[in-house]
UniProtKB/Swiss-Prot annotation:
InterPro entries: PFD_beta-like, Prefoldin. It comes from Schizosaccharomyces pombe (strain 972 / ATCC 24843). This is Probable prefoldin subunit 1. One of its GO terms (biological process) is protein folding. Pfam families: Prefoldin_2. Belongs to the prefoldin subunit beta family. PANTHER family: PREFOLDIN SUBUNIT 1, PREFOLDIN SUBUNIT 1-RELATED. Heterohexamer of two PFD-alpha type and four PFD-beta type subunits. Gene3D superfamilies: 1.10.287.370. Binds specifically to cytosolic chaperonin (c-CPN) and transfers target proteins to it. Binds to nascent polypeptide chain and promotes folding in an environment in which there are many competing pathways for nonnative proteins. GO terms for molecular function: protein folding chaperone; unfolded protein binding. The keyword Chaperone applies. Keywords: Chaperone. The keyword Chaperone applies.
Amino acid sequence: MQNLASQIQEKAVDSQQQLRTIMVQIAAKERALKISELAKKELEDVGEDKAVYTSLGKMFMKSDLASVRTHLDAEMASLREDIEALQKKQTYHETTASNAEQHLQKIKESIS
């Protein structure tokens, strides 16, 4: 019984640690998505005849406005997919942690 309780407790602690990591990752992805959305919004105001430059390491390279917009769209779609996958992981670990806590509570009640 003691061994089972320690395994459940380890699972709960592991899930809580994973939750914290996932929450940080979600926040970072949401921040990057917000930056991409703002960049796209700014590019909407830019005329087709204006020069657009993209970062290439420490340099900037002149790019086609359409390709920059396409790149931003692809980046935003990828970020949204990543956020969705992380949210699924978050839900899984929240459920796992909750179930582990419930099992620990039942074990404590059965011992008492």
